[in-house]
Amino acid sequence: AGLSEQEIERFVIPQRTRRHRAEKNEPLTVEESDRAVRLARIQSLAEETFDDPEKANRWLRMELAELGGEAPLTVAQTEAGTRVIETILGKIAWGAAA
């Protein structure tokens, strides 16, 4: 469950950069940290909403018409997109049509 290595590379930090920073014992940048926290927040909220990590993972990767055919995980790359995903998950949690 959770983000794959490829998704971390795509959405947070490229693997080569991550390895280079680890070798030099350097932290993530503020932007990288923000992206990592944002994606962890959405992952956690989806798991809480669906009460099932596998359902949450499938939903996060599902292309949704409501998002113009994009997957929630893709939309959540920005803070504004994350707020949209949080709103949709809130509607799902409260039983409204998402």
Placement of each model-derived feature along the sequence:
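Non-transmembrane "mature" sequence context
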Residues: A1-A98
